[in-house]
Amino acid sequence: MRGLDLGLLDYVSAWRMMKILHREVASGGDDAFILVEHPHVITVGKHGRTNNVVKWELFVYVVERGGDATYHGPGQLVAYPVVKLRWPLSRYLWMLEEAVIRSLRPLGVEAGRVEKHRGVWVGGKKVASIGIAVEGGVAYHGVAVNVSTDLSYFYHINPCGLHPSAITSLNQLGVEISLEEYKGLFVEAFEEVFEAKVVWVDPAPYLAAAAQLRASPTLLSAPIEAST
């Protein structure tokens, strides 16, 4: 499985890269795995409700994934596997959750699932969100884990229909770990659950190709300073 570590990258560029990789995988190419940290942004799933965005102060996009409104920002690790869907959809979602759950065990964090809500939970609070899309038998979008995220930004939304106070982070749970340190734990757990080896490749050609694309997710709102 190809791995691309993009560091801090705007949402649209990462979305375009997902589109490029999706096309490659659908055409028979190797599966891919993106790791990224986004600047402040809100995305809403295609069947989500825009009234779950309560403060229109950030970039807000409607995207193909399932789920409702969510926030991405600094201190949050986002993983976008772009993979041929070899499993039932419910199993694939379980595997994404399981990768997060296993990644937290070395930190002494006992995480799990809750009935009726996707994602990963600790003590009744959500530490990771999941939302995917499937087109042509290939899954993309993925999972976001709050490591040192500024949780105040979740008050811009009702995250997946929840009250913002239901969201937590590793730092809030008392785990002092950097995004880079956690990244290694997550990759190890992901490889274990998916029985795959991530082989890291240079993202530069993909970033260059993404920069040439004109397609973008649907923009609902932009910060005033970005739109003037």
From Swiss-Prot:
InterPro entries linked to this entry: aa-tRNA-synth_II/BPL/LPL (IPR045864), BPL_LPL_catalytic (IPR004143), Octanoyltransferase (IPR000544), Octanoyltransferase_CS (IPR020605)
Keyword Transferase among record annotations: yes
Reactions it catalyzes: octanoyl-[ACP] + L-lysyl-[protein] = N(6)-octanoyl-L-lysyl-[protein] + holo-[ACP] + H(+)
Main location (coarse class): cytoplasm
Compartment(s) of residence: Cytoplasm
Biological or metabolic pathway of the protein: Protein modification; protein lipoylation via endogenous pathway; protein N(6)-(lipoyl)lysine from octanoyl-[acyl-carrier-protein]: step 1/2
Site residues, Lowers pKa of active site Cys: 126
Catalytic machinery residues: 160 (acyl-thioester intermediate)
PROSITE patterns for the chain: BPL_LPL_CATALYTIC, LIPB
Enzyme Commission number(s): 2.3.1.181
Record-annotated BPL/LPL catalytic domain positions: 27-198
GO molecular function: lipoyl(octanoyl) transferase activity
Keywords: Acyltransferase, Cytoplasm, Transferase
Positions of substrate binding: 65-72, 129-131, 142-144
Any single GO BP term: protein modification process
GO CC annotation terms, alphabetical: cytoplasm
A Pfam match: LplA-B_cat
Role: Catalyzes the transfer of endogenously produced octanoic acid from octanoyl-acyl-carrier-protein onto the lipoyl domains of lipoate-dependent enzymes. Lipoyl-ACP can also act as a substrate although octanoyl-ACP is likely to be the physiological substrate.
Note: In the reaction, the free carboxyl group of octanoic acid is attached via an amide linkage to the epsilon-amino group of a specific lysine residue of lipoyl domains of lipoate-dependent enzymes.
Membership in a protein family: Belongs to the LipB family.
Protein name: Probable octanoyltransferase
Organism: Pyrobaculum calidifontis (strain DSM 21063 / JCM 11548 / VA1)
Species classification: Archaea, Thermoproteota, Thermoprotei, Thermoproteales, Thermoproteaceae
